[in-house]
Amino acid sequence: MSKHGVEQLPAARALTWPQRLGQYWKLVRGDRPIGSLLLLWPTWWALWLAADGLPPLWTLLVFTAGVWLTRSAGCVINDYADRWLDPHVERTKSRPLATGAVSGREALWVFVVLMLVAFALVLTLNWLTVALSVPGVFLAASYPYLKRHTHLPQVYLGMAFGWGIPMAFAAVQGRVPLLGWLLYAANILWATAYDTWYAMVDRDDDIRMGSKSTAILFGRFDLIAQGILYALMAATLVLVGLRADLGVAYWAGLAVAALLVAYEFRIARHRERGPCFRAFLHNNWVGLAIFVGIAVAVAGR
């Protein structure tokens, strides 16, 4: 404890370079790719819809690499913001910043390097995409601090995670049509829902530590709220399909996604930590099902 009664974080431990690189890899969640996949699928939805088929190869590479870079940077800044909280939460107490294996200054440098590389890639695209990347950086950097001030950080996460959608339309079409904003809205609803599963895992710890989340806001009505979120997501994706004049494959993909979501409710119905976390992870397959539906639908025109 400090003289002011505030618990001190442990100092960064002396590590060999291989060990330190391993801690950096853990810091950016390289060992847990689920977050990158949840960010990748909606970005690919947008690229395939914007291009009405396979997008230009360089654009596809830039956005795919950008997904990993920005998600990794987001994890770093999230851990930096939560470095005082994570040591007290069961799920996060082994993170590199929480254990002292990586210092706060190191984490900020990792964040800056990742964002600079991502921005360098964006600079190879058109001016509108570059301009849209600026609010994207703000969303990614500010999200971790929302949980201290609002019960809706999951909504903000959806805004941050989905910002690649308008950027993808800008890169391919040079504009962001209504279709792009509909897809963005669907992603906000989806991300709010799947991150609420995640928040349900930490709900007891968050209440104890004074953090806020949709899981706490919804309380005993959490499953009802989840149902509403997923229903609104589905309705928005129906509008996407109608506006883009997508064929049977798309509707089949949505049907598969709906069945996958129903399974999530089945396994998480008792609100236990393990099943809620599995429901969160299961959204990878939801995103994949929708992507396959879009890709096959536009390929078959």
Curated annotation (Swiss-Prot):
PROSITE patterns: UBIA. Its cofactor is Mg(2+). Pathway: Cofactor biosynthesis; ubiquinone biosynthesis. GO terms for biological process: ubiquinone biosynthetic process. Keywords: Cell inner membrane, Cell membrane, Magnesium, Membrane, Transferase, Transmembrane, Transmembrane helix, Ubiquinone biosynthesis. The chain crosses the membrane at residues 34-54, 57-77, 108-128, 152-172, 176-196, 221-241, 245-265, 279-299. It is a multi-pass membrane protein. InterPro entries: HB_polyprenyltransferase-like, Prenyltransferase, UbiA_prenyltransferase, UbiA_prenylTrfase_CS, UbiA_sf. Its main location: membrane. GO terms for molecular function: 4-hydroxybenzoate polyprenyltransferase activity. Its EC number is 2.5.1.39. It catalyses: all-trans-octaprenyl diphosphate + 4-hydroxybenzoate = 4-hydroxy-3-(all-trans-octaprenyl)benzoate + diphosphate. It comes from the Bacteria. The keyword Magnesium applies. GO terms for cellular component: plasma membrane. Belongs to the UbiA prenyltransferase family. Catalyzes the prenylation of para-hydroxybenzoate (PHB) with an all-trans polyprenyl group. Mediates the second step in the final reaction sequence of ubiquinone-8 (UQ-8) biosynthesis, which is the condensation of the polyisoprenoid side chain with PHB, generating the first membrane-bound Q intermediate 3-octaprenyl-4-hydroxybenzoate. This is 4-hydroxybenzoate octaprenyltransferase. The gene is ubiA.
